Amino acid sequence: MTYGKKNIVAGLFFLAAFMIYGFVLISLRDFAPGKALWIADYATGTHFESRLAHVHGNLFAFLNIMIGYLILHLPVSAFSAKWVSWLGLTGMLMPIGIVAEFALGASPVFVLAGGIAIVASMTWLGFAVWRAKLV
């Protein structure tokens, strides 16, 4: 699979997964036995972290779809395409890390690594497009 296509495929599956996760959050708000407590904790703790993961998961899915599309359609060097692609995919560790933090008590290292990777990917892609010979 080519660089770019990997990002589009991963982004679409990631988007689907975090959309399903959004439906789980809706069911917790509307139908779960402890829904009053869930609603009361809207801006704190697990509820806040779960919403943070949902929004970043969908954002990073979209960013990977965009990364893939731009890599495939703009004259970005192969070296830049490879690194931008892998950094974008690595960025998806951030929302996964947020879920792992509150659900499994995992270290925030995945959140930090993913955040750094997605910022690096966007910055590198910006410079690569800037340097590209566009007509």
Give each language-model segment a name.
Residues 2-54, 58-135:
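Polytopic transmembrane helical bundles with strong interfacial aromatic enrichment
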